[in-house]
Amino acid sequence: MRLVSKLLKALLVLLLAFGSVRYSCDNYTSGELQICKYTAPQHYRAIIGGRFPQVIKYSDSLVAKYETVVVPRVGSAVIHVKDTVEQKVVPSVIRTSRSSLSLVYTKVYPRVVKYAFIAESSLCRWYLQLCHQYTVYVKPVVINLYYKTMIKYPFLEHAIYSVQAQYKIMETHVFKYYNIISYNVQVWNDKYGYGRLSRNKIFIRMKSTVVEHLIIWYRYVNNRCRKMWRENLCPIINKSRERFAYHGGVRPESATTDPDDESIFYEDDDVDEYTETSTIVLTVTQTANSALDLKATPSASGLIVDECDMSMEEMLRNDFMSWKITIENKLSNTMKDFENDINEFAQEKLDHIQPTLADLLKRASNTSQTNFQIITKAIMDVNCTESVDPKTNKTIWFDQNNTQLPKYMTRELMREYFSAAHSQFDALSQEIRAHLRKLADEVNDHVEVLRQENVELFEEWADVMITEWSKNLAYVDVAVNEEKLADLEKEQRKNWKDFMKLKRQVIKTRDTLMEHPVKLDSLQSFVNTVQQSLKTLSHENGEYLYILRSKANLEFQAREALERQQREKEKAESASMKASTEFELSSSSFSSSSPSTASSCTASSTSTASLLAVEKTIALEDLQSYYQNVSSTDSL
């Protein structure tokens, strides 16, 4: 089985290679290459015809038989199948598709839309309920518990910010080493990997050859696909469209149209017929000399009679209700209008201040990160190496990477770095707080201005409406005849009571508007977010600077201990050198003394000789103490 698959793969590769070569020969080289000659079918036909003429005769007979027998039969079968498909299959497919579409549009789609709307409404309702439960019950409890815990156990907050600071340090180191590794990998790739390979001439030639062959093969496949599309698929698609348009056309409806006819794609049976009756009232002015005698139509006269026959009680009730509804609507919308004005102003201020504060917070964060990097680099420069410039004979210092430092890192310079970090962050914090205070002052001032404007507008409107309404009620009292006064007295008394009730309600609404609390939820949420972000940045900056200060202090202590040890060592070496010099001077003075004193200094010479013998075996740091002991012996 594996052998068969390998043979098939090899055959496929050979066919593809042969096809690409023939395409190149036919379209680009015009048969000038030798490979085009050897891959041409005429070449092999001539060779085989010269050696095996029977094979050529047999192949020609097969081709003639194919053209005379097989092609007509296959063509007739194809024509038969084509006619069958066009006459039976295509109309049935069209009818089925139309009925399916009609079923989907009339029954399936409305139900899907209905249930989807129900599901969406249920999901939205459930989501809103969940958000409400979380906002009202869960979030305040969690926030309260968090702040109580932080107040009761402050070390937890310190631990949290310490962990965050350590995480930022770790992130900085990881990013640093990642960049180093990436750079080294890139350098290695450029020296020994693909970069080196891409500079090889043989690889370049092979790559260009492969790319050229791939382009040729792509063009060949693309041309074949285009040719197949134009010659085979496009005619079939065009004929199918024509037949679908022919079978799917809507015929005009006639008196003998069958209701079950499938050519009617859609029929609307729910259209209700209706008639509209219009009444025209004609008004005619007749003069004394006119001979016209015009009469109103029955419908017009009936309409006029209905309006005239309306009772006074109904007219009063309708008029009173119109005034009452207008005033009640205004009272109910007064607070909403005021809140809408406030919200529009708050949104305008929020759109104006939000980019500024976001930029300031970003600057504060970037400034902190920059100062952290500067201080971290300064801490690394504490442990430096001292050297001497051979040209200027000045002391210079190098860091761990053997890079010369511009300045020697001292505690005073480190304090300046920390002071600059604190001052820069404090300046940005003060600027952010100043913007917040300015925003609060502007909002409060404008809220009072809007409140005063709305109150004045409401007072003016209420004064006009109440006055006009009271005048209207008074006119009704005067216009009513004495005969009907007894019947309408009760109604008018009730109207006056309702009028006074609404008047008191107007006054109460005005007082409420004067003291109505303003809820700026979006603006307050934004201010809280900015304050929380600033608090978080301040905590992170303080904690991380504290950690860096401790680390810098440890580095300075280690360096000072090393310098102290070095100074002590140098001091001990200088003392040893001084002692050895004094000893040599005393030895030379004893050897140059007079012979008369030789007998008295025998013990001293003996001790000096013993000292010279012992000096070779004792350590350098014990030389001074040994010399003092010998001097005391000599003096004695």
From Swiss-Prot:
Keyword Iron: no
GO terms for biological process, alphabetical: sporulation resulting in formation of a cellular spore
Cellular localization per UniProt: Mitochondrion
Signal peptide residue numbers: 1-23
Record keywords, A-Z: Coiled coil, Mitochondrion, Ribonucleoprotein, Signal, Sporulation
Coiled-coil residue windows: 433-460, 551-584
Gene Ontology annotations for the cellular component aspect, listed alphabetically: mitochondrion; ribonucleoprotein complex
Name this polypeptide is given: Outer spore wall assembly protein SHE10
Recorded name of the encoding gene: SHE10
